[in-house]
Amino acid sequence: SPFLSKFNPLVKEQRSGADLFYFDRGDKIGDAADVFANEVRLLIDQHGNSNNRLAVDKIMLHGLRSLEALNFIVVDGEEVTEKSRSIKGADEIKAMRCASYACEKAIFEMEQVTRSEVCNANLSENDIWSVLHAENIKRGGEWIETRLLTSGPRTNPWFQECGPRIVQNNEIVAFDTDLVGSYGICVDISRTWWIGDQSPRPDMIYAMRHAHEHIMRNMELLKPGVHMSELTHNAHKLDEIYQVGKYSCLMHGVGLCDEWPLISYEDKFVEGAYDYHIEAGMVLCVEALVSPEKGDFSIKLEDQVLVTEDGFENLTKYPFDEALMGN
């Protein structure tokens, strides 16, 4: 609704959405699309010297056909928007710092509940995950895009959603926030905890240290001027036992959500797909999923990292689990 932005001096014009949904346009959706397309035409005539090239990132089919009927040449706008969002301005970086701080406070509350209640043998994965939701909303956040919190053997393979399973004493709990937080900024970080009164197994400690080394070594590669392919080819290598279950990428951009670019592992590298250089102001999430093949656990770590003029700054301050680090 236009009134939601009238208070904002940065917004010069307010317009309602095109609203090309069948459920509220019915069999006259084509007419509604024509009205929208004509509004776009008038806007382009006013500001664009009758330029008929139009970049659109997402569009309903009726809208596309109506624009083309007015002789617009519609091209893909997703590349334009992704690249324009990839370099953050000073205000965006401030907002991301605030969002990161709020997210980590929410994680802290989730960890406190987890560590205090698991011993009572009545805390489910859903119970734990609900704390992050509530604490995110409490701090001005918006929503969480996934349900990536699992415990014990459900951490391997990764990408199982949280459910009603009761977390047991002396088990791993791993999660990926994937949340849209304060100021509409995405905070996408991961941690793995050991919950229990005994020590984790040696193979778990080794995997945790290996995952920690993986993200720390890889973020050290980040600085302006580095070609994206260099990040792939110079990355820290996971042990062979973790190759099958490793994450889908080494790093990915982040801003309003997960964004361009994606830095792949060597076995997923596509020549020419990301023929660009890292620039100051980019923010990338550096990933590690250390998941032993046919194992009964996974370690998931992820930090959100800002590329600075002379290197990088890790925006993520949340500590790593002391027991799993072997301390």
Language-model segments: residues:
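Active-site neighborhoods and metal-handling regions in enzymes and metal-associated proteins
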Residues: 1-327
